[in-house]
Regions:
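Active-site bordering "gate/hinge" segments
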Residues: 1-377
């Protein structure tokens, strides 16, 4: 009988494995450096910068209305959130109160965007897991949401719905559009129910992702994690509960406790019905009146800040207004603070789970790459 020789600690060599900048499981280009010992990740480093477009710098000196339109280009998934928050900055600084009907339409657009983002998350996560059927199913359900966004905003990616004082008249909701939205929500509700029954309740799938990429609650708070990734650790924090725009709507804040891939997946599955609930309330109680107030006047303002809750967490916009133009624009997206969680989640897990640990945080590196500071040029 041959005695098995156990390797000494000195025999284990740390290996660096690089993934990216282009990788089959990545929706966007970014680089991941994994430092591995015996196929277990000991350290992870995510490098961004490939998607840099300098949007904040381009906004400098532009007329406020034009700069607001440019913010849509920050992110193709959360385009509505960016222009909405940028418009909110101007409205807060200029003291503009928009018509309630316009606010309801903005909420409908934002929750539709949250739906399509969460379905994209489920589709991408299923693909990384190797379940192509579930991935295609999520994309199929998402298509209903995309068509509703196209119907209201005129495009499937960038809608340009929000403007200073309300929403564009072309985004007005008539009876036909309201009926289409109601029917669409019925279809999406049926779709997510079937998806959950077949995917979330599958013991093979759940056993594959349970206990993987764990982010403890204390660590999540320390890393300043935001959005569903933070709520997946048990922290009951959703900025929508503090936003006056959401005061007319009744919905629940979803939380999970384990902070692993399973908890993050369940977060999105369970948040989808809440968004459907908000949209149904909005179309049922849609106020009458105008969708835009054009009686406002432009004047100089010091730096104004605005925070809103978007599909990935807290989005921050700020700028000052001088002679009707934007000054000192700053945008902070949720993925900027969540990068630390993505790196932490990889540590201690097998190398084959590394990309899954990153995907669970729903990264969007394109919106994170907005500005670049060059030191000692």
């Amino acid at each position: 009988m041959v005695e098995e020789k156990k390797p000494n600690k000195q025999d284990v060599i740390e290996t660096e494995i690089s993934m990216g900048t282009v990788h089959p499981t990545a929706l966007e280009p970014y680089r991941v450096r994994l430092f591995v010992e015996d196929e277990i990740v000991k350290e992870a480093e995510i490098t961004i910068g490939v998607n840099h477009r300098g949007i904040e710098r381009i906004m400098e000196g532009l007329p406020v209305e034009k700069a607001n339109s440019l913010t849509e280009k920050v992110c193709g998934i959360c385009s509505n959130a960016h222009i909405w928050n940028s418009v909110l900055v101007a409205e807060k600084g200029l003291g503009i109160e928009i018509p309630q009907r316009a606010n309801y339409i903005r909420i409908i657009m934002e929750e539709l965007e949250r739906l399509h983002s969460h379905f994209l998350y489920l589709a991408h996560g299923s693909e990384v897991l190797g379940h192509e059927t579930f991935s295609m199913r999520a994309f199929y359900i998402r298509e209903t949401v995309m068509e509703l966004l196209r119907m209201i905003g005129g495009n499937r990616v960038q809608y340009g719905a929000s403007i200073i004082g309300g929403v564009r008249p072309r985004c007005e909701l008539n009876e036909m559009r309201i009926q289409k939205i109601a029917e669409g929500m019925d279809d999406v509700e049926k779709g997510i129910t079937k998806f959950a029954d077949r995917f979330v309740l599958d013991p093979i799938v759940m056993s594959r992702i349970e206990g993987i990429g764990v982010i403890p609650q204390k660590q999540a708070i320390k890393l300043e994690v935001t959005g569903p990734t933070l709520r997946a650790t048990g922290v009951n924090q959703d900025l929508r509960m503090k936003m006056k725009e959401y005061e007319p709507f009744d919905f629940d804040v979803i939380t999970q406790d384990d902070g692993d891939v399973k908890s993050n997946l369940l977060m999105r599955v369970l948040e989808i019905p809440e968004s459907i609930k908000i949209i149904r309330q909005a179309i049922k109680n849609l106020p009458s009146g105008s969708v835009v107030d054009r009686s406002w006047e432009m004047f100089d303002c010091n730096t104004i800040k605005s925070y809103i809750e978007v599909p990935r967490g807290t989005l921050y916009h700020s700028y000052a207004i001088e002679d009707g133009r934007v000054r000192n624009s700053v945008i902070r997206t949720p993925s900027m603070t969540n990068i630390g969680a993505m790196q932490y989640a990889c540590i201690g897990d097998h190398i084959t789970d590394a990309q899954l640990c990153i995907v669970q945080c729903d990264p969007c590196f394109t919106c994170t790459d907005r500005a670049m500071k060059i030191i000692n040029l």
